Amino acid sequence: MSRKSKKIKKKVFKDSKYNSQVIAKFVNRMMFDGKKSISETIVYNSIDMLAEKIEEVDKIAAFNKALDNVKPLVEVRSRRVGGATYQVPVEVREERREALAMKWIISAARKASGKSMQEKLANEFVNSYNSTGAAFKKREDTHRMAEANRAFTHYRW
């Protein structure tokens, strides 16, 4: 049994514009050097651009669908058994799914060249909404790795 106490999860408040906890988490993950107002502006404008590009009335629904399309269901974790290290496929918890999806979308937008961050993030949202783009590719690669190592599922812990 672990001697460590359970980590207390920090409560994330809902964002001011859409009253959504998921968008608030996304804003926090986008933030650099504690500059939340800049991060909020970028995220809100890119959500507006997303709704504009796909002609969606409900902006939050469009954002959530883009995020859901990138969430991974399984991932591989290293497990050492008798001197050999195996990549064991493991199901991903819901909180981690959300965190990975956000991380992948943001990193894909940051890697894109040219344009402003708002446009790059909006394009990545559109790509995620349409199940294409770098973030979706990352999800597919993760699933492919898990599928390739399916033989080692009995090493799960």
UniProtKB/Swiss-Prot annotation:
Q: What is the lineage of its organism?
A: Bacteria, Pseudomonadati, Spirochaetota, Spirochaetia, Spirochaetales
Q: Which UniProt keywords apply?
A: Ribonucleoprotein, Ribosomal protein, RNA-binding, rRNA-binding, tRNA-binding
State the Pfam families in the record.
Ribosomal_S7 (PF00177)
Q: How does it assemble?
A: Part of the 30S ribosomal subunit. Contacts proteins S9 and S11.
The organism's place on the tree of life at top rank: Bacteria
Query: What family name appears in the similarity comment?
Result: Belongs to the universal ribosomal protein uS7 family.
Gene3D superfamilies in the cross-refs: Ribosomal protein S7 domain (1.10.455.10)
In alphabetical order, the GO MF annotations are: rRNA binding; structural constituent of ribosome; tRNA binding
Q: What does it do?
A: One of the primary rRNA binding proteins, it binds directly to 16S rRNA where it nucleates assembly of the head domain of the 30S subunit. Is located at the subunit interface close to the decoding center, probably blocks exit of the E-site tRNA.
Protein name, per record: Small ribosomal subunit protein uS7
Q: Name one GO cellular component term.
A: small ribosomal subunit
Q: Name one GO biological process term.
A: translation
